[in-house]
Amino acid sequence: SAINNGYKDVHVDIKISDGSPVNVKNVIEGEASIAMISGSTAFEAWNSQIGTESSYDGKKLCALGACYPECSQWIAFRESGLHYVNELKGKSISAGVDASVTEAASRAVFETLKIDEINTELFGLGLRESADALREGKIDSAHSFYTAPFEAFEVLAGEREIVLLEYREEELESILRRNPSWCRIVIPAGQYPGQEKDIVTFGQKVLLCTSTEMDEETAYGIAKALDQMAAEYTGGHRFMASMQDKD
């Protein structure tokens, strides 16, 4: 990893977790030294918005760096004739599993575009289930709030011509006002087979976080390693290329 190779005073062991909310709790309570946490979850933790039973102090959460973005991606087959997200009203679409980050993003989109279960057929499918449903013709479009390219969507794009649906500028501005942790993100042309132009969407940064209990020297060493080893860390991972963006 970038940290192990760039900062010899520490060694990082990787463990699979149950998601950002659990990672927040583990970091603050000392069960984990560092963890990957989505920007929106970190924001909610800092503002004590994660659950009414949380006993930890969200102000103890500290970000060491932004590692990669995850963003809103609506995919459809080119033959559908769809071009914009606002054309999904009246269609059959997958909005993500209940309480997932994809579902939360879908909800903000639907509120902006006046889409609901009355005027549109909505399915709460997981990301890979959504891709399968689109392939089988059960839905017209699938939504992913994840890294780009998302593997299951990339496989679809290799099988049939796809389009990434676009947001209009005023729609993006309205969506971004709903969540201060979201930002404008560009999916570069060529991320998916057949994607001919950049797609402007919204998303969030995934942060490497620790607690304020970590000593300053160690925190600085880890952050410095992330910066200096960015080129090595992003090698072969297109969605992590933004780590090298100094802006």
Model-assigned labels for residue ranges:
Residues N4-K8, I28-A32, N47, E79, ...:
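Sec-exported extracytoplasmic/periplasmic mature domains
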